């Protein structure tokens, strides 16, 4: 039962992870129009700003997550606070630099999720159930990506791209508190 509950919580966290990661793609056009960004700036904001920090921080965070005394749940909660807060900050960005810095923050925060989650799953799931457990957790990728596109598009059409970032980011802060409990 503990493993099942943990997997459901981790799945929800991973859905938020990919929702916040992918929402920027559907919002690129209205952001570009509103802030007068070039295609190069959009590419930097949607790609390298996130990916470089996510990639380079993933390995050291994974090493930290694997330490025996690391509080993996706490690491996931802090990561969720960082990426959700930074996603919400994207919604109040007034220029390219602010948006770029917020997207870097999303990458930094999200870098801590998967290593800690995989380490936690490895601790809780017996070897014969680990592959299934990680597969269940990984369902967050397509579900979160889909929700990011759908929610992002619907909210942006109705209320603007800024509201889409706020609606995507702010609930993650509440989720982080629940995860930590």
Label the model's feature ranges.
Residues 1-19:
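Cytosolic juxtamembrane N-terminal segment immediately preceding the first transmembrane helix
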Residues 22, 50-59, 111, 145-146:
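Residue-level signature of mid-helix packing/kink "hotspots" within the transmembrane helices
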Residues 27-56:
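Extracellular/periplasmic helix-loop-helix junction of adjacent transmembrane segments
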Residues 30, 59-63, 154:
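Membrane-interface helix termini in secondary transporters
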Residues 36, 69-70, 92-98, 109, ...:
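Helix-breaking motifs and short loop linkers at transmembrane-helix boundaries and internal kinks
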Residues 56-97:
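Conserved MFS/SLC helix-loop-helix module at the cytosolic interface between two early adjacent transmembrane helices
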Residues 102-142:
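Cytoplasmic helix-loop-helix junction between adjacent transmembrane helices
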Residues 137-181:
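Helix-loop-helix hairpin linking two adjacent transmembrane segments in secondary transporters
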């Amino acid at each position: 039962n503990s493993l099942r509950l943990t997997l459901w919580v981790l799945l929800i966290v991973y859905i938020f992870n990919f929702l916040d990661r992918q929402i920027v793609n559907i919002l690129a056009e209205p952001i570009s129009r509103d802030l007068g960004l070039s295609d190069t700036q959009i590419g930097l904001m949607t790609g390298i700003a996130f990916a470089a920090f996510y990639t380079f921080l993933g390995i050291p965070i994974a090493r930290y997550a694997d330490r025996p005394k690391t509080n993996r749940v706490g690491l996931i909660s802090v990561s969720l606070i960082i990426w959700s807060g930074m996603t919400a900050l994207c919604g109040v960005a007034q220029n390219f630099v602010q948006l770029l810095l917020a997207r870097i923050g999303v990458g930094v925060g999200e870098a801590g999720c998967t290593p800690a989650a995989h380490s936690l799953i490895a601790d809780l799931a017996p070897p014969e159930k680990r592959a299934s457990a990680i597969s269940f957790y990984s369902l967050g990728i397509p579900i979160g990506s889909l929700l990011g596109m759908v929610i992002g598009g619907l909210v942006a059409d109705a209320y603007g791209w800024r509201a889409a970032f706020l609606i995507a980011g702010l609930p993650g802060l509440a989720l982080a508190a629940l995860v930590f409990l």
